[in-house]
Amino acid sequence: MHALRSSVLALWLCLHVSVRAWMTYRSANGLDEYEPEDRIIFVGTKWCGNGNVAEGPEDLGSLKETDACCREHDMCPDLIEAGQSKHGLTNTASYTRLNCACDEKFYNCLKNSSETGSGAVRFTYFTLLGTMCYRNEHPLICVKKGWFSCSKYELDQSQPKRYQWFDVSSNFAFPRMLT
């Protein structure tokens, strides 16, 4: 059963990467008209993916705990849409980026869920997608590079706080969690 679940997850991830590549191509070539059929929603959910297929805020899929986490994440009040600017930051990604507090809450919600699907959603969002979030914090200095991003930061307490981008990763290494 574990091998089947792993194979399904791998297939879903390959499909997701292919669709993201197609969406990036469409956007870069002026074909970024968003169609509902372009949505990829994680199986068993209505809110976990790019957009949602829910009929309303109370409409959840069969993975109710996981879906509730995604719904709350989708409703984050502090976000920067693709191509937009806020807090002196410009989101150059092709998707919305959120305040780190929303991503941290999402991570903890998925981690505390007893459903199997929550682990796959958490792995996809926090490990595979390589997204970023923002927060008002003292400037960061990267003291150790990982494979794809900085793996250890230090805060420069001598400088004033400012809004800045942070890597969202599986270890969720945000400044307030560092020593």
Curated annotation (Swiss-Prot):
Gene3D superfamilies from the UniProt entry: Phospholipase A2 domain
Keywords for the protein's UniProt record, in alphabetical order: Calcium, Disulfide bond, Glycoprotein, Hydrolase, Lipid degradation, Lipid metabolism, Metal-binding, Secreted, Signal
EC supergroup of this enzyme: hydrolase
Broad class of where this protein is predominantly found: secreted
Catalysed transformations (reactions): a 1,2-diacyl-sn-glycero-3-phosphocholine + H2O = a 1-acyl-sn-glycero-3-phosphocholine + a fatty acid + H(+)
Organism: Xylocopa appendiculata circumvolans (Japanese carpenter bee)
Family to which the UniProt record says this protein belongs: Belongs to the phospholipase A2 family. Group III subfamily.
One example GO MF annotation: metal ion binding
GO cellular component, one term: extracellular region
Cofactor note: Binds 1 Ca(2+) ion.
Pfam families tied to this protein: Phospholip_A2_2
Residues modified by glycosylation: N112
Disulfide bonds: C48-C70, C69-C109, C76-C102, C100-C133, C142-C150
Locations listed in the record: Secreted
Tissue specificity note: Expressed by the venom gland.
A GO biological process held by the record: lipid catabolic process
Protein name: Phospholipase A2
Cofactor: Ca(2+)
PROSITE patterns: PA2_HIS
Residue positions assigned to the propeptide: 22-39
SUPFAM superfamilies: Phospholipase A2, PLA2
UniProt-listed Enzyme Commission number(s): 3.1.1.4
InterPro entries: PLipase_A2_dom, PLipase_A2_dom_sf, PLipase_A2_His_AS
Role according to the record: PLA2 catalyzes the calcium-dependent hydrolysis of the 2-acyl groups in 3-sn-phosphoglycerides.
UniProt superkingdom: Eukaryota
Positions annotated as active site in the UniProt record: H73, D103
Classification via PANTHER family: RH14732P (PTHR12253)
